[in-house]
Design a protein with these regions (language model features):
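Short, Lys/Arg-rich N-terminal segment immediately upstream of the first membrane anchor
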Residues: 1-5
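Hydrophobic membrane-insertion alpha-helices, especially the h-region
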Residues: 8-24
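Conserved hydrophobic/amphipathic alpha-helical signal-anchor segments
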Residues: 23-78, 84, 122, 126-130
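Periplasmic/extracellular, small/polar-rich flexible segments of pilin-like filament-forming proteins
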Residues: 58, 74-135
C-alpha cells in the first residue's frame, strides 16, 4: 500500500513542476512580445509628437505624414509598429490619433498612458492656439 501512494505523490509533484516550468516559459515569451510592442508604440508616439512640434501643434492625419520624420529610417520599430499595430488617425489636425494593439500584448497600462499623452498634447496645442488668437 505504501508504494502506490508514494508513486502518486511523486507523479503529482512532477506534473506540478512541469506545469510551473511550462507556465514560466509561456509567460516569458508573452512578456518579451509585450516589451517589443511597447517599444513600437513608443516609437510611433515619438514620431507623432515630433510631427506636432514641427507643425505648430497640428496632429498628423495619416501614417505617411510621420514617415518622413527624423529618426524614421533608423528605427525599425516605427515601420514594423505601423504594420502590426493600429493607429486610428483623426479627421482633423486638432484631434489626437488613437493607438490600438490589435490583440498584441502590451505592458500594464501602456496603451492608456500613451493615448493620454497624445490627448494631452492635442489639448495643449488647441489651448495654445486659442490663447494666441486675438479676441
Amino acid at each position: 500500500m505504501r508504494r502506490p501512494g508514494r508513486l502518486i505523490v511523486i507523479a503529482v509533484a512532477v506534473m506540478g513542476l512541469a506545469a510551473f516550468i511550462a507556465g514560466f516559459w509561456i509567460t516569458a515569451g508573452v512578456r518579451e512580445r509585450a516589451r517589443l510592442t511597447d517599444r513600437q508604440l513608443e516609437a510611433i508616439v515619438a514620431a507623432i509628437e515630433h510631427y506636432a512640434r514641427e507643425h505648430g501643434g497640428d496632429m498628423p492625419q495619416s501614417a505617411e505624414a510621420i514617415q518622413g520624420m527624423p529618426g524614421w529610417a533608423s528605427s525599425p520599430d516605427m515601420a514594423e509598429g505601423l504594420r502590426l499595430l493600429t493607429v486610428h488617425w483623426p479627421p482633423s489636425p486638432d484631434l489626437a490619433p488613437v493607438l490600438a494593439a490589435n490583440g498584441r500584448p502590451t505592458g500594464l497600462g501602456t496603451l492608456a498612458r500613451l493615448n493620454a499623452r497624445l490627448r494631452s498634447l492635442a489639448r495643449r496645442s488647441v489651448v495654445g492656439q486659442t490663447a494666441d488668437e486675438p479676441s
